[in-house]
């Protein structure tokens, strides 16, 4: 049994997934305009721990974490480097995978790019 603190009700509650045996998690990922920093690594690590705990408890986990590939910071970076947004996002997504991989963070089940879903 997994018990979680519900900040809305301010009570501990027994976790019951919507679909028995399966947990679906969505976590907002980084804006990929530069290399990650500790603020980007922290949620990747934290939610990796949550995911692994659910898996340890026997749940199938569907973990989705997006890449924000449209943003004012990204447009500014594109102009600074005189490179396309796609070139920049491809570079920093690759670097993100390398960096979180070095931290032993498991890859998400899916990493959609925001631009593909607007």
Swiss-Prot record:
The cellular component terms of Gene Ontology attached to this UniProt record, alphabetical and capped at eight, are: cytosol
**Which reaction equations make up its catalytic activity?**
tRNA(Cys) + L-cysteine + ATP = L-cysteinyl-tRNA(Cys) + AMP + diphosphate
Top EC class per UniProt? Answer: ligase
State the InterPro entries in the record. Cys-tRNA/MSH_ligase (IPR024909), Rossmann-like_a/b/a_fold (IPR014729), tRNA-synt_1_cat_dom (IPR032678)
Q: Which UniProt keywords apply?
A: Aminoacyl-tRNA synthetase, ATP-binding, Cytoplasm, Ligase, Metal-binding, Nucleotide-binding, Protein biosynthesis, Zinc
Cofactor(s) demanded: Zn(2+)
- What SUPFAM superfamilies does the entry give? Nucleotidylyl transferase
What EC number(s) has UniProt assigned to this enzyme? 6.1.1.16
Q: Name one GO biological process term.
A: cysteinyl-tRNA aminoacylation
- A single Gene Ontology molecular function, please? ATP binding
List the ranges annotated as motif 'HIGH' region: 30-40
- UniProt subunit comment: Monomer.
To which protein family does this belong? Answer: Belongs to the class-I aminoacyl-tRNA synthetase family.
Q: Which PANTHER family match?
A: CYSTEINE--TRNA LIGASE, CYTOPLASMIC, CYSTEINYL-TRNA SYNTHETASE
Q: What is this protein called?
A: Cysteine--tRNA ligase
């Amino acid at each position: 049994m997994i018990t979680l603190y519900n900040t809305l009700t301010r009570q501990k509650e027994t976790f019951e997934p919507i679909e028995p045996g399966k947990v679906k998690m969505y976590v907002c990922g980084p804006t990929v305009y530069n290399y990650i920093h500790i603020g980007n690594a922290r949620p990747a690590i934290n939610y990796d721990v949550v995911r692994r705990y659910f898996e340890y408890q026997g749940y199938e986990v569907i973990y989705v974490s997006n890449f924000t590939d449209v943003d004012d910071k990204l447009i500014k970076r594109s102009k600074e480097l005189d490179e396309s947004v796609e070139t920049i996002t491809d570079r920093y997504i690759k670097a993100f995978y390398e960096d979180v991989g070095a931290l032993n963070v498991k890859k998400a089940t899916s990493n959609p790019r925001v631009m593909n879903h607007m």
